């Protein structure tokens, strides 16, 4: 897990979700790695000590009971963000290297499923999502939520048209762990199927044996999941999806950012994002299988 200081208010929810899944799979061998990122290159703080926003979680049960490997990044280091972390943390010998995000909670049986799955080739495993902004995401949408997602036909296009859908859960809805567990408990047996490549970085399980790098060396953040998806396509790495288990990616989390007024519309953010996307384009153009 890579946590920025301004994501602090989501950590308790995220970590308790991981704890629940760990305790539900006592036989699974899980090594937890966490990066606390205190850098302020992009987001200017409105609080006196961004560091304290993350340090307060040192006594959390996840820290105390499972002793994660902790990495610290601050302004004494060059610019470092989630794409750097994901590029560096991959373990080609581990059964799975899992990407998570601060705004995402996981199914109770997440680690039990990973412990159970046996696929004898490099692959990527994902968990089902909610209806997104267009039908291209249907291939990785939970099987009980299909049939609701329709692209906007308005002219001009309206980004919020999905609000009109009748789906019980949409990508903009905030879902709690209790609600996620109830939905998944009612979803029956584990169904895993091969799907066309469609990856979002909120919860991705990357098997052993992948050729690296699969994220452009010059990428720091923004679209590293897209870069990985394109690499999988080019290298014919299959994707499978647990279509009967919903992940809880709270894209519009009510406490997404604390201690800063910065947003993705800031010029500094756009500058770093453009650099990362340029690095991705160059990397993919020169990629061989």
Label for each model-derived stretch:
Residues 40-94:
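Active-site-proximal specificity loops/subdomain of glycosyltransferases
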């Amino acid at each position: 897990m890579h946590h920025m200081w301004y994501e602090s208010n989501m950590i308790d929810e995220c970590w308790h979700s991981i704890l629940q899944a760990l305790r539900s799979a006592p036989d699974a061998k899980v090594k937890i790695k966490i990066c606390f990122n205190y850098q302020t290159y992009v987001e200017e703080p409105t609080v006196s000590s961004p560091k304290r926003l993350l340090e307060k979680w040192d006594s959390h049960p996840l820290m105390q009971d499972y002793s994660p490997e902790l990495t610290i990044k601050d302004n004494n280091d060059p610019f470092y963000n989630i794409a750097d972390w994901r590029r560096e943390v991959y373990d080609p010998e581990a059964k799975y290297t899992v990407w998570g995000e601060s705004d995402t909670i996981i199914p109770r049986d997440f680690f039990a499923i990973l412990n159970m799955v046996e696929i004898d080739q490099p692959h990527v495993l994902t968990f089902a999502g909610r209806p997104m902004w267009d039908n291209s995401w249907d291939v990785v949408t939970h099987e009980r939520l299909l049939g609701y997602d329709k692209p906007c036909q308005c002219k001009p296009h309206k980004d919020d048209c999905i609000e009109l859908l009748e789906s019980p859960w949409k990508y903009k809805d905030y879902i709690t762990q209790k609600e996620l567990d109830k939905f998944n408990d009612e979803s029956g047996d584990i169904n895993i199927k091969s799907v066309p490549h469609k990856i979002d970085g909120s919860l991705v399980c990357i098997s052993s044996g992948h050729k690296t790098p699969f994220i452009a060396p010059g990428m720091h953040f923004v679209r590293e999941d897209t870069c990985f998806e394109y690499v999988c396509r080019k290298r014919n790495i299959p994707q499978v999806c647990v279509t009967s288990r919903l992940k809880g990616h709270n894209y519009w989390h009510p406490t997404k950012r604390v201690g800063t007024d910065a947003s993705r519309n800031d010029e500094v953010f756009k500058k770093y994002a453009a650099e990362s996307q340029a690095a991705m384009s160059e990397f993919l153009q020169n990629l061989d299988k």
